[in-house]
């Protein structure tokens, strides 16, 4: 799978779009807001800037995209006013992979600029927004051009499927699974860990060149508390997806060989793994490294023990995952809309049954970093 060409959130504003099904990601941004505010405040306190470079890496599309940069601008403006500093010009860079729905973002900019002018008094001559297509596992910006980097719900995606997993052997390495599971052999766990150890330092090293001395970076991604990569909080959504896919295999709707050759380019690290890679690279001070839980549906359904509650939470969790992974499933399995609908209907039922018994939650890590001088 060519991840950089295939991976994108569902486009547009339809029923299955990311724009309509990104409540979990929005909640993650909201919970992490105090940490973002702290970082932005320190930049504004320590510098009187004429122009401020801000990048959102893995911006996707939909309401979360412009909401994030709007809130960062609010923070800078409020701190500047308190200190009696002039509000800097804003250079805002929205980055994602080439197949991201940048058109939707650009179409929403006129209304966004209008709100900036009406609500904040910031005109188009003081705010410059650019789309930057490319992988953040490499350089994206000129040296020392950024003051703040934000990335939320993106760094758990790997640059590629770990090498060696797509085996042509008689018995596939991760048979019947789409990610790490309790039954995965150690070689699968090791391959995913190695890919993270390759990708994450490339991200950190690239940002170290692009950020000014004292620049700040706040990263948020799915992770896990335990050092064990097979824990439910990091794996079970994929385990249940594999169950739904295998039910289609048993009915002859999907080829089993296709399942055995599909491996999700995702990795949920523990805090220690992140800490080790940051310290090894050496360009950043870790100011904060924290974690928190979040419901699979973003906490929208409170009572999951009734038939209606079980149905609703399953449907919401299924729509949230579909908005994120449909592009990869469509590319790999080559299935049409009817089978895709069937797959996520089955997944919704499986998830509803599971969450009515055990309220498994995602675990999210937030890291706040300062570029060393």
Swiss-Prot record:
Annotated EC: 2.1.1.141
Positions contributing to S-adenosyl-L-homocysteine binding: 18, 59, 64, 96-97, 135-136
Residues involved in jasmonate binding: 25, 156-157
Catalysis: reaction(s): jasmonate + S-adenosyl-L-methionine = methyl (-)-jasmonate + S-adenosyl-L-homocysteine
InterPro entries with a match to the protein in the record: MeTrfase_7, MeTrfase_capping, SAM-dependent_MTases_sf
Pathway this chain belongs to: Lipid metabolism; oxylipin biosynthesis
Record note on cofactor: Binds 1 Mg(2+) ion per subunit.
GO molecular function: metal ion binding; methyl jasmonate methylesterase activity; S-adenosylmethionine-dependent methyltransferase activity
Statement: the UniProt record of this protein carries the keyword Endoplasmic reticulum: no
SUPFAM superfamilies: S-adenosyl-L-methionine-dependent methyltransferases
Keyword Cytoplasm among record annotations: yes
Record keywords: Cytoplasm, Magnesium, Metal-binding, Methyltransferase, Nucleus, Transferase
Subcellular location per the Swiss-Prot or TrEMBL entry: Cytoplasm; Nucleus
Residues marked Involved in substrate discrimination (site): 150, 222
Cofactor(s) required for function per UniProt: Mg(2+)
Protein name as it appears in the record: Probable jasmonic acid carboxyl methyltransferase 1
Organism annotation: Theobroma cacao
């Amino acid at each position: 799978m060519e991840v950089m060409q295939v991976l994108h959130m569902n486009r547009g504003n339809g029923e299955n779009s990311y724009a309509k099904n990104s409540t979990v990601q929005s909640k993650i941004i909201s919970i992490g807001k105090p940490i973002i505010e702290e970082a932005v405040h320190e930049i504004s306190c320590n510098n009187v800037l004429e122009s401020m470079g801000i990048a959102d890496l893995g911006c996707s599309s939909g309401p979360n995209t412009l909401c994030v940069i709007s809130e960062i601008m609010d923070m800078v403006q409020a701190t500047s006013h308190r200190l009696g500093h002039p509000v800097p010009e804003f250079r805002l860079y929205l980055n994602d992979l080439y197949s991201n729905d940048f058109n939707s973002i650009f179409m929403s900019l006129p209304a966004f600029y209008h709100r900036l002018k009406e609500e904040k008094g910031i005109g188009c001559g003081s705010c410059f927004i650019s789309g930057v297509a490319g992988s953040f596992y490499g350089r994206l910006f000129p040296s020392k051009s950024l003051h703040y980097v934000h990335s939320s719900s993106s760094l758990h995606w790997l640059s590629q499927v770990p090498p060696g997993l797509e085996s042509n052997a008689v018995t596939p390495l991760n048979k019947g699974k789409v990610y790490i599971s309790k039954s995965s052999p150690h070689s699968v766990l090791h391959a995913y860990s190695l890919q993270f150890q390759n990708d994450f330092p490339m991200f950190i090293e690239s940002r170290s060149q692009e950020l000014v001395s004292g620049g700040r970076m706040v990263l948020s991604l799915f992770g896990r508390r335990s050092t064990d990569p097979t824990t439910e909080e990091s794996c079970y959504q994929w385990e249940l997806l594999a169950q739904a896919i295998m039910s289609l295999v048993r009915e002859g709707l999907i080829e089993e060989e296709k399942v055995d050759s599909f491996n999700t380019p995702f990795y949920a690290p523990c805090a220690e793994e992140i800490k080790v890679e940051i310290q090894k690279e050496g360009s950043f001070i870790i100011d904060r490294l924290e974690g928190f839980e979040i419901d699979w549906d973003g906490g929208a359904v409170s009572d999951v023990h009734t038939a209606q509650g079980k149905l609703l939470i399953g449907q919401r969790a299924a729509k949230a995952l579909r908005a994120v992974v449909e592009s990869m499933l469509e590319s790999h399995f080559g299935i049409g809309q009817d089978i895709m609908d069937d797959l996520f209907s089955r997944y919704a039922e499986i998830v509803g049954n599971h969450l009515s018994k055990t309220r498994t939650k995602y675990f999210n890590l937030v890291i706040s970093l300062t570029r060393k001088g």
